[in-house]
């Protein structure tokens, strides 16, 4: 006899712990009942992923010549992903970037003065094999959406760890006032 079971989790379910799971099979013949199988504390195979990237991206001091070049100020980084897939079933892994400070457009995160809040430039991200080539102050194929759009990374069928090249670019505005500036965003991984 082969027995299999599954657990369905609604996509809208809140995160939480898995309950203790039991499986019992009974065989009945007339009034005669027998316990055939009794499993307690079944383990539900699941996928879990963690994300590793720089928490702070320092662009340094911006000079007037950097505001007119149009290339932006580039900082090399990486997006590291570590996933365990206990079930072995194909699982799509994706990510999203959500702006935590003033909203920009789909592909930009405004950098604002810490005193006064004026916008001094836009930050762009570029992810993947072409990130270094694409990185600049224009949208390209490897551009990172900054509007919470989920973007696929890859599909996994087992335990996998990998790192994707990530380039952050600050595109300073020629009209920016001098001073310290900041921007914040969160990167989330989904499976």
What are these regions (language model features)?
Residues 56-70:
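Beta-sheet-dominated interaction scaffolds and their linkers
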Residues 48-58:
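Proline-enriched interdomain boundary motifs that mark the N-terminal boundary
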Residues 13-22, 71-78, 161-164, 175-184:
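Short, solvent-exposed loop/turn segments enriched in Ser/Thr/Gly
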Residues 68, 114, 153-161:
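Short proline/glycine- and polar residue-rich coil/turn motifs
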Residues 41, 184-190:
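Short, low-complexity, Pro/Ser/Thr/Gly-rich segments in the mature regions of secreted, periplasmic
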Residues 69-141:
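Surface-exposed interaction patch
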Residues 1-48, 64-65:
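N-terminal export/ancillary region detector
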Residues 2-11, 162-174:
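Short edge beta-strand/strand-turn motifs with a hydrophobic/aromatic core
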């Amino acid at each position: 006899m082969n027995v299999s079971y599954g657990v369905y989790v609604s996509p809208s379910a809140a995160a939480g712990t898995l309950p203790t799971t039991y499986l019992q099979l009974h065989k009945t013949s007339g009034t005669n009942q027998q316990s055939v199988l009794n499993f307690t504390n079944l383990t539900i195979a699941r996928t879990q992923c963690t994300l590793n990237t720089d928490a702070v991206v320092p662009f340094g001091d911006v000079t007037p010549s950097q505001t007119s070049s149009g290339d932006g100020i580039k900082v090399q980084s990486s997006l590291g992903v570590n996933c365990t897939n206990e079930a072995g079933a194909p699982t799509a892994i994706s990510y999203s970037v959500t702006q935590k400070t003033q909203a920009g457009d789909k592909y930009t995160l405004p950098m604002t003065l810490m005193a006064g809040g004026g916008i001094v430039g836009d930050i762009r991200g570029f992810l993947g094999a072409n990130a270094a080539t694409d990185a600049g102050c224009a949208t390209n194929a490897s551009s990172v959406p900054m509007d919470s759009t989920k973007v696929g990374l890859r599909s996994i069928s087992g335990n996998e760890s990998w790192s994707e090249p990530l380039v952050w670019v600050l595109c300073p505005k020629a009209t920016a006032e001098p001073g310290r500036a900041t921007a914040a965003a969160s990167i989330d991984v989904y499976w």
